[in-house]
């Protein structure tokens, strides 16, 4: 099965119900789809009125070993009293298979949206990220990747070169902006950071609030620098971001040491995410869900904006990184 051409069109509701029934779960409600483009995720209630979420993994994105590492990390975090959504085991197995689809079942965890502009909530998140990374430092992922330039920049650049989605009249300017951004990131990238297991996609949308934070969706977990799990929480102008980062770090360091030199990786990581995200959209374009939900990807205005965004981010990389107050 070719990853780029795969769709979930064969994953019918009956297939999902049968997969759950094989594990002794009888669905007593409908299957409510949750917001996920990469995988297929559904919330439901069983006959005992317990609420669960079932997640069907996109084939060939992660291997079984890589998914199991994600599950093992989540279970270790729960054991260390870090609030994450961890998979349910059936006969000792968290990774299940039905008709060629890998899937897992999670308890449904409700909660309010995390308020990124709430300093008290930000402090609590920083504290639990410190605890998460305390667990993350105990060992590294063996099968899951480490954040680096090849996956996030070099491979996407090759994809852009051959892409037919980019309007022909705009492609040269877009590739030039991409090359300038890659050069700027490469000049500021460091390979000497301490590597640990990360959440990997720790933004406000992946944190629920229930008298404290609840971290969800470890699908992008990988090895990398600690700052990767901090920088996406920052918002607002430089002064606001400085205050937020200082709040996070102070709480974080109650449990884990933080290397402030990693702050210099924030803008390189932001640039890498911009490039990687666009490549992800293009790789998934054969899946009907993507043209339906991202129709603007075929428009000239979108590519003009992307080109301008890449040029602007390359300029940002020439500026001094975010500075903390002298006490740090």
Swiss-Prot record:
- Uppermost EC category: transferase
Required co-factor(s) are: Mg(2+)
Q: Which residues form a coiled coil?
A: none
SUPFAM superfamilies the UniProt entry points to = Protein kinase-like (PK-like) (SSF56112)
NCBIfam families (alphabetical)? PRK11768.1
UniProt keyword Ubl conjugation present: no
| Family to which the UniProt record says this protein belongs | Belongs to the SrkA/RdoA protein kinase family.
HAMAP family cross-referenced by the UniProt entry:
SrkA_kinase
Q: Name one GO cellular component term.
A: cytoplasm
Instruction: Supply the alphabetized keyword list.
Output: ATP-binding, Cytoplasm, Kinase, Magnesium, Metal-binding, Nucleotide-binding, Phosphoprotein, Serine/threonine-protein kinase, Stress response, Transferase
Task: Name the site position(s) for ATP.
Answer: 36
User: What gene is this protein translated from?
Assistant: srkA
**Lineage from the top down?**
Bacteria, Pseudomonadati, Pseudomonadota, Gammaproteobacteria, Enterobacterales
Q: How does it assemble?
A: Monomer.
> Catalytic residues per the record?
201, 217
Name assigned to this protein: Stress response kinase A
Q: What is its EC number?
A: 2.7.11.1
| InterPro entries per record | Aminoglycoside_PTrfase (IPR002575), Kinase-like_dom_sf (IPR011009), SrkA/RdoA (IPR032882)
Q: What does this protein do?
A: A protein kinase that phosphorylates Ser and Thr residues. Probably acts to suppress the effects of stress linked to accumulation of reactive oxygen species. Probably involved in the extracytoplasmic stress response.
Which residues are noted in the entry as Mg(2+)-binding? 206, 217
């Amino acid at each position: 099965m070719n990853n780029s051409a795969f769709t979930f069109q064969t994953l019918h509701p009956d297939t999902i119900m049968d997969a759950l029934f094989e594990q002794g779960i009888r669905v007593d409600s409908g299957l409510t789809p949750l917001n996920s483009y990469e995988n297929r995720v559904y919330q439901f209630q069983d006959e005992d009125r317990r609420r669960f979420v079932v997640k069907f993994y996109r084939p060939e994105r992660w291997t079984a070993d890589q998914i199991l590492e994600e599950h093992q990390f989540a279970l270790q975090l729960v054991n260390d009293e870090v609030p994450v959504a961890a998979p349910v085991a059936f006969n000792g197995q968290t990774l299940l298979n039905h008709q060629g689809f890998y899937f897992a079942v999670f308890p449904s965890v409700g909660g309010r949206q995390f308020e990124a502009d709430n300093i008290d909530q930000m402090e609590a998140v920083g504290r639990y990220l410190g605890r998460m990374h305390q667990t993350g430092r105990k060992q590294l992922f063996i099968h899951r990747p480490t954040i680096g330039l090849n996956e996030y920049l070099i491979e996407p650049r090759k994809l852009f070169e051959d892409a037919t989605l980019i309007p022909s009249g705009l492609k040269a300017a877009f590739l030039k902006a991409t090359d300038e951004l890659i050069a700027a990131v490469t000049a500021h990238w460091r390979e000497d950071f301490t590597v640990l297991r990360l959440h990997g996609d720790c933004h406000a949308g992946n944190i629920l609030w229930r008298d404290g934070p609840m971290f969800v969706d470890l699908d992008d977990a990988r090895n990398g620098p600690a700052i990767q799990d901090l920088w996406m929480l920052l918002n607002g102008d430089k002064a606001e971001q400085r205050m937020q980062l200082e709040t996070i770090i102070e709480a974080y360091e109650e449990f884990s040491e933080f290397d402030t030199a990693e702050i210099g990786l924030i803008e390189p990581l932001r640039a890498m995410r911009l490039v990687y995200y666009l490549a992800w959209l293009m790789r998934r374009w054969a899946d009907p869900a993507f043209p339906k939900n991202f129709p603007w990807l075929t428009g000239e205005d979108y590519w003009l904006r992307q080109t301008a965004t890449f040029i602007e981010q390359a300029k940002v990389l020439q500026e001094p990184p975010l500075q903390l107050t002298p006490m740090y």
